[in-house]
Structures are given as structure tokens and as C-alpha cells.
Amino acid sequence: MPNVTIARESPLQDAVVQLIEELDRYLGDLYPAESNHLLDLQTLAKPDIRFLVARRSGTVVGCGAIAIDTEGGYGEVKRMFVQPTARGGQIGRRLLERIEDEARAAGLSALLLETGVYQATRIALYRKQGFADRGPFGPYGPDPLSLFMEKPL
């Protein structure tokens, strides 16, 4: 298997911008706009976001981020995505583990997330990694197309 690295990088690189555009198209095909809670590239580049890039043999194949809520003491998992051609190699799991490491290093007590109900593989990964269902949090309201999850750290 080719070498996979995961590191904090800028989301403003051309290859990452293309990956985020691919993610936006994917989510746009699954959910209506009001059920897509996406952080834009400029927000992903802010200091309270830890943006991670997965590379396989140097090529961008995935990403994930943690948005730090210092008032709430938690981090929110955002923008988790692995290109379809790179799936099956544990890259998503490794990204999520690195996000957990970043959250612990920031002194956060929990990771929270919102994901879409039609993403069974992603939901299974979150559950396998110890996330449990919970109600809406932060800026979110109830949405039949959203699933909210939490993992204490």
C-alpha cells in the first residue's frame, strides 16, 4: 500500500480546494442546501480550525477538520472526506484519530459532529470509533436529515 501521511495543512492549496469542491458536489447531491452545514474555505483557514490533509504518495486524497469551541470546551468534526478511489484503506479512520489527538492536545473534553443520515459508511466509522448519538448542539436545530453524535475524550 502506498505511503499515507496526515498533517495539518492549509485548506487554500489548489489540490485541497479541488477536494473540497468534490466534497461539496457529493453532499449537494445527497442533501438540500438547508441540510448542508458546510464551512467555507476561508473559515477553514481560521486559527480556531485545525485542518488536516491526507496524502497518499504525496497526492491529496482526504481531509478533515476540527472546529474548536473554547466556550463549550468541545471540538466539532468538520469536512471529513476521503476520495472514493482512496476508500477502503483506513484513511478515514486515521483522519478521525488524528482529529481526536488534536482535540486532546487542545484540552477539549469532547468531540461533537453533525453528519447526514444517508452516509451509512461514515456513520459506521463514527460509531466504531466510539461516537454515540445525541441531540442537536451549538448552531444546529432538529433536522430529519442530520444525525448528531458525541465522543467524550
Curated annotation (Swiss-Prot):
Keyword Calcium: no
GO MF, one annotated term: acyltransferase activity, transferring groups other than amino-acyl groups
EC number from the UniProt entry: 2.3.1.-
Keyword terms: Acyltransferase, Transferase
Ranges for domain N-acetyltransferase: 4-153
Keyword Acyltransferase: yes
PANTHER family the UniProt entry points to: AMINOALKYLPHOSPHONATE N-ACETYLTRANSFERASE-RELATED, AMINOALKYLPHOSPHONATE N-ACETYLTRANSFERASE-RELATED-RELATED
Stated role: Participates in the tryptophan-dependent indole-3-acetic acid production, which is a phytohormone released by A.brasilense.
The protein's name in its UniProt record: IAA acetyltransferase
Organism: Azospirillum brasilense
